[in-house]
């Protein structure tokens, strides 16, 4: 999509910087990775995701794309339309999308905002029916494979594994985890004088690493 931006070897100074890093990572990854499913996550407790999602939608539009911003529920989509009237024609909820849209919408990039385990079936159906790119912002799909039969669990794990994390920033008890496309995963250790890079990994570490 665009020329890759050098990846910093330190954590962003503030949330505004992290948000810009996320936008650049998404734009850099579109067309640069083989996956049609990109995930971007800012995992801060109490984060107001709506304005971040709307600004990402605007950044995608400014880059020449025609995104459809999808919220799982109608109430959140209605609030987004009120907050960003300039984007209201691009904002839908899952039911509106699944019920049928204009033919051209089916080829647009989908920006799905925070799908939860309870949205799993609807979201998977939307993704599998969509021929274009899907960008998932702050999704929580991993928990959708818990508490179901083994066959369904394996199918869901396969769907979860189909996503490429182009951006990830997560505070940890003793540090932080970050990935900015196209770089590796970076683990930071929290020291008395700040955060220091502790190492890099080619894939996301699990909770036991």
Regions found by a protein language model. Name each.
Residues 2-82:
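Electropositive, gly/pro-rich neighborhoods at or near active sites that engage anionic ligands
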Residues 21-24, 71-107:
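A short, well-structured beta->alpha microelement
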Residues 61-62, 82-88, 104, 124-131:
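Short, surface-exposed basic-aromatic patches at helix termini and helix-loop junctions that form
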Residues 100-102, 113-116, 125-126:
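Conserved mixed alpha/beta catalytic, RNA-binding, or beta-rich assembly cores of soluble enzyme
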Residues 132-149:
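Redox- and metal-dependent alpha/beta enzyme cores, enriched for Fe-S-associated oxidoreductases
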Residues 145-209:
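A conserved mid-domain beta-alpha-beta active-site/ligand-binding segment of alpha/beta enzyme cores
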